[in-house]
């Protein structure tokens, strides 16, 4: 399928890389962004003329203007979709501008430039079909499957309700923590903060305009924020009351250890870590394949014994620093390297 990408910001570029890897020819147009010459369209009209499906990869506040810009050039056999993080408003705009004449649907890819660069998997997409064009949703689902994505169908309202209590609240909490200095360089942190620190890092790596969009464009975000603030206020007040009444134990967060034996808890954690290791190996394989394609473009051989030797030496040093069995860690990474060569067909 020939794809046109209107908007070549961080997500537009990331989507282009997925399309390239899947073998979908594509062009892009953006009035300000730098686009590789081989896929740069001459303008909006040329972009629309050359594609079978048009991706509106623009910020949500710019969506109405983008639709007005391309609408005169669209044809009934084409397919149009957006990729915004909010769906109620954008889906309504698609219906209003394109109506019954142009097939369309709303989508929200639950990944971005950072997760793609890290080769995080699985890739998931929420698809919001338009009642005017049920067949368009089927075409879009096939397209995303060809990119290696899992697809979940939701109404725009159901999507935004879930995003209000997950995506929007995550950014809201993260901004609060950053504003009180929790994201600054700290001399030490407990393990319980590590996941939060990762969240803060992820939020800071996202597009700067996304915070306001998630809070102000999602019709359910205000209610989610109010509910959270009320819950935090109640907890804050109950802390003082518990001290006065001597009932602080009632505020304790349920402890996993009180519900499962120590051995079972340890085994559960081991299983979870092993799942994470497998997911990391999948991500590593994706990066290895990406490196292999880059080598092929440069005319370099896939197998690089000198680099493998340096890798093993570095991993032995890491093992020593961590107090692990050096030979055991080397054996693990030799197996990883064998798997990498097998994935590359070498």
Residue spans of the language-model regions?
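NAD(P)+-binding Rossmann beta1-loop-alpha1 motif at the extreme N-terminus of oxidoreductases
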Residues: 1-46
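Rossmann-like NAD(P)-binding element
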Residues: 45-74
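Short glycine-/small-residue-rich Rossmann-like dinucleotide-binding loops
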Residues: 58-60, 85, 130
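Rossmann-like NAD(P)(H) cofactor-binding subdomain of soluble oxidoreductases
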Residues: 64-116
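Domain-level signature for soluble enzymes in the chorismate/prephenate branch of the shikimate pathway
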Residues: 86, 90, 137, 144, ...
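Internal alpha-helical scaffold of NAD(P)-dependent oxidoreductase catalytic cores
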Residues: 122-204
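Interdomain hinge/lid region at the active-site interface
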Residues: 187-257
